[in-house]
Amino acid sequence: MKPQQLATQKFSEHYGYSAAQTVFAPGRVNIIGEHTDYNDGFVMPCAINYGMAVSFSKRDDSVWRVYAIDIDEQDEFDLSRPIEPSEHKWANYVRGVVKYIQEKCPEFKQGADLAMTSDVPMSSGLSSSAALEISIGKTAQVLGDLPLSLAEIALIGQQAENKFVGANCGNMDQLTSALGQKDQVIMIDCRSLEITPTPVPHGYSIAIINSNVKHDLVTGEYNSRRQECEFAAKFFGVKALRDVTPAQFIERAAELQAENELAYKRAKHIISENQRVLEAVEALQAKDMVKLGQLMAGSHDSMRDDFEITIPEIDYLVELAQVAIGKNGGARMTGGGFGGCIVCLVPDEKVEHLRRIIADNYEKQTGIKETFHLCTACDGVHLI
């Protein structure tokens, strides 16, 4: 059963009446451009056909009752009182979004009953948290008929995750969940929020292979990577690493390396990765899948060697996928790192070959069974 149907059904069972409306917000996969978003750089993700559905109805008071179907837990809070953190981690994503919506729209106090469910695998690097934030943001916007654009809802989601949940994420995940387009990857300039849609080439599929090694950004190494990037930006005297050209980096690389080896390696990844994203857009537009595959491979190598966020299981998955796909297409780790998924752009006629190569080898080598998802690029958050 799809999340949209499950949310509607479980809402009725839980609350004893039918939901008025349902919102769906997709997860995302990032084709190329990793950890560049919080460096004001470029990313090239697409929204995917897995996501979070929220069924909801207005109440005649200011209380939100939120039923999390997948874990059978409920949270309740009053919009007419200051919103405090909950002991349930999932509930803080909801509370955080509502809190920061109220900062922008102080008159918003509309109560509601909500039931939500997701088919985005948790801790997979496919943005289950952004899908949750954007679905809640859109729900609040509809409930209060609030004058918020989709980009504003995305930035509120990011704010909630940064300040209320405590994960120092960039804005890519939320922007993609809010602004995704059917059959398109979207290059996002994470500073200007300008979007360049580019069609997924005909005859190619997006395969996502989950290593089933879980990652946890809040307690992981994500925040230290961010600090190392900020150190490097300060070294170059710029607002963010996006402002450093490859030539400027080369000029002072030895000096930075002598001062802070880790900051040097992190900056090397970010600056080269921004360049790869810009070249990837050109490659896609030219339907040059050999070039795109090379850029994806370069991105993975840089994440492994310079940003140091891959793990052996992920590196092995990427090696298997690259062998199976060949030159026309590519594979790389996607998401924050330390587990999660790889993304592949694969010719349709090689999808089953890829699936078989992975199935025959990955579990044998690692002792972990992978999960294989074929995805389509889809629209961002919408009412159903």
Swiss-Prot record:
One Pfam match: GalKase_gal_bdg
Q: Pathway, per Swiss-Prot/TrEMBL?
A: Carbohydrate metabolism; galactose metabolism
For this protein, the parts annotated as crossing the membrane are none
Where along the chain is Mg(2+) bound? S129, E161
Which residues are substrate-binding?
Answer: E34, H35, T36, D37, Y222
In alphabetical order, the GO MF annotations are: ATP binding; galactokinase activity; magnesium ion binding
Family matches, as Gene3D superfamilies: 3.30.230.10, GHMP kinase, C-terminal domain
Which GO terms are recorded in the biological process aspect for this UniProt protein? galactose metabolic process
- Cystine bridges: which residues? none
Q: What is its EC number?
A: 2.7.1.6
- Residues engaged in binding ATP: S123, S124, G125, L126, S127, S128, S129
Q: Does the keyword Metal-binding apply?
A: yes
Question: Does Cell membrane count among this protein's keywords?
Answer: no
List of catalytic residues: D173 (proton acceptor)
Q: Which UniProt keywords apply?
A: ATP-binding, Carbohydrate metabolism, Cytoplasm, Galactose metabolism, Kinase, Magnesium, Metal-binding, Nucleotide-binding, Transferase
Fetch the HAMAP family from UniProt: Galactokinase (MF_00246)
This one is known as Galactokinase
Question: What species was this sequence derived from?
Answer: Actinobacillus pleuropneumoniae serotype 3 (strain JL03)
